[in-house]
């Protein structure tokens, strides 16, 4: 009897690099998986995890998608007759249908293609790119406030452990305290 394999796309063991800054600076609308055209020394560097996606971006040129600004540091063991360029532009491989969709979407004002995650899939390097719209400063502040509010709610719920039986003396009043806090919080926003 054959063992069943579970699908794992982008699990922590397969992830090479993440662009954490992208989720802070952009509203992510659509995601796409793209292959990369790489040289041999680049694959070896990726296996060593020597890549930075933070400053990366994608552009459409001549009906193709190109990756710019991704720094791939060469290993010290690279051959002497090869002169590696760490900031080389790399071609992304997408289906024609996805390319047509992206060409129309990127031409709209305010939209950009940004790299999110670089990972291994069946022995090949894949890049998750996103069609995203840039956030304004006030949008970033609003998301920070929302994150802080959810943290505070979690703290309050953790402090007052609510169970059906054996409630502590404070837990009975804890729900009222939480409601008052929520009402106060909504008035202040």
From Swiss-Prot:
Keyword match RNA-binding:
yes
The secretion signal range is none
Give the primary localization class: cytoplasm
Tell me which InterPro entries the record gives. SmpB, SsrA-bd_prot, SsrA-bd_prot_CS
Coiled coil start-end:
none
Q: Which Pfam families does the UniProt entry name for this protein?
A: SmpB
In its UniProt entry, what is this protein called?
SsrA-binding protein
Q: Where are the transmembrane segments?
A: none
What lineage is this protein's organism placed in? Bacteria, Pseudomonadati, Pseudomonadota, Gammaproteobacteria, Chromatiales
Keywords for the protein's UniProt record, in alphabetical order: Cytoplasm, RNA-binding
Q: Which family does it belong to?
A: Belongs to the SmpB family.
What's any one GO cellular component for it?
Answer: cytosol
What GO MF terms are annotated? RNA binding
Q: Which superkingdom, per the lineage?
A: Bacteria
Record's function text: Required for rescue of stalled ribosomes mediated by trans-translation. Binds to transfer-messenger RNA (tmRNA), required for stable association of tmRNA with ribosomes. tmRNA and SmpB together mimic tRNA shape, replacing the anticodon stem-loop with SmpB. tmRNA is encoded by the ssrA gene; the 2 termini fold to resemble tRNA(Ala) and it encodes a 'tag peptide', a short internal open reading frame. During trans-translation Ala-aminoacylated tmRNA acts like a tRNA, entering the A-site of stalled ribosomes, displacing the stalled mRNA.
Where's it found, cell-wise?
Cytoplasm
UniProt organism field: Nitrosococcus oceani (strain ATCC 19707 / BCRC 17464 / JCM 30415 / NCIMB 11848 / C-107)
Per the record, the GO terms for biological process are: trans-translation
């Amino acid at each position: 009897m054959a063992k069943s394999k579970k699908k794992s796309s982008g699990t922590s063991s397969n992830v090479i690099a993440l662009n954490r800054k992208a989720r802070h600076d952009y509203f992510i609308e659509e995601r796409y998986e793209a292959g990369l055209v790489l040289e041999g020394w680049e694959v070896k560097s990726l296996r060593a995890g020597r890549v930075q996606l933070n400053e990366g971006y994608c552009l459409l040129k001549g009906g193709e998608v190109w990756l710019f600004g991704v720094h791939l540091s060469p290993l010290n063991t690279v051959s002497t007759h090869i002169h590696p360029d760490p900031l080389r532009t790399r071609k992304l491989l997408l289906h024609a249908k996805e390319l047509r969709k992206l060409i129309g979407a990127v031409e709209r004002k305010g939209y950009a293609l940004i790299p999110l995650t670089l990972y291994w899939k069946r022995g090949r390097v894949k890049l998750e790119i996103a069609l995203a719209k840039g956030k304004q400063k006030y949008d970033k502040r609003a998301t920070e406030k929302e994150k802080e509010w959810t943290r505070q709610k979690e703290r309050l719920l953790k402090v007052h452990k609510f169970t059906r039986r054996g409630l502590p003396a404070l837990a009975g009043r804890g729900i009222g305290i939480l409601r008052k806090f929520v009402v106060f919080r909504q008035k202040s926003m």
